[in-house]
Amino acid sequence: MAIRAGKDVQCEKPTLTINEGKLLIDTVRKHNRVFQTSTEDRSVPVYHRMAELVRNGRIGKLQRIEVILPRQPGRPGDPTPQPVPKGFDYDMWLGPAPEAPYTKDRVLFEFRWISDYSGGVICDWGTHLFDTAQWGNDTERSGPVEIEATGSRWEGGLYDTVKEYDVTYRYANGVTMTCRPGNPSIKFIGSEGWVGNTGWRAPLQASSKEILESKIGPGETRLFTNPKGEHRNFLDCVKSRKDPYFPVDIGHRVSTVCHLANIAIDRGEKLKWNPEKEVFIGDDQANEMCRIRPGRGEWKLG
């Protein structure tokens, strides 16, 4: 609604489905708006530095990326209906999502763990560390070609998104990326070393002092960032009318990587993905999972 009303937008990640992300790109471009995908990672020095080192060959030929996401939530959520707090427009909060009874475990931060509104921890945290992974792999406007995953969802409470997971992606350039739960971290492994960190925003680590102290020289790849943060970058672009450092198409691509994992877990088999056409190859059921979901009442997208 905001984009169609002529507003520039900074929007928290992720989109709800793959096709919703495609519609978002079309809407931003149709109305010529500035759109910033909101994850702060591209302004965090350790992730910017990590991606630049990988892109400039400091670890040799990139072979594997290992991503670990935190274990969230820590409980299944209480579905017991509660009175809607005074002054809270719960119907507006639900928007196009299905009607459901109010409970505090459904709203605010906790919406992330309910599949009517989000894709769980893989989407919530994956949009952070998968973006760094795709940035370093030079696939930020593309994606993997194959996904294989196992996992299970929360049961017995309010939450229904993925709880346990083991995901492997394969890219056309031969790089593989794995994703498992644990202490949030990312590691790029190449033919001549590795670089990464253990812990959110934790200090950079590498297989050698030479990699850690390496300088990016003239003529090498420089990745655009803004140390003053995503909000400053967005405001600068509102004035300049240029794309911000995390524009709508790149935001959509990293959300897609997250959705691919959830779909592969639900399908229970290896999936082939065409990142150019943005469709699964030979799997109609998986493609159906990419759809824009029907809206509630007068709410609709498209």
Question: What positions do the PLM features span?
Answer:
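Active-site rim elements
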Residues: T37-T39, S115-C123, G151-G156, G217-F224, ...
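Core domains of carbohydrate- and sulfate-ester-processing enzymes
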Residues: E66-R106, C290-I292
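Beta-strand-loop-alpha-helix segment that lines the small-molecule cofactor/substrate pocket
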Residues: M1-S43, G57
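C-terminal helix-rich "cap/oligomerization" subdomain common to oxidoreductases
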Residues: V34, D160, D236-G302
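Non-transmembrane alpha-helical segments in soluble domains
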Residues: I25, A51-V54, L94, F130, ...
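Basic phosphate/pyrophosphate-binding loop/patch that engages nucleotide-derived ligands
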Residues: D26-R33, R49-R64, P73, P81-P85
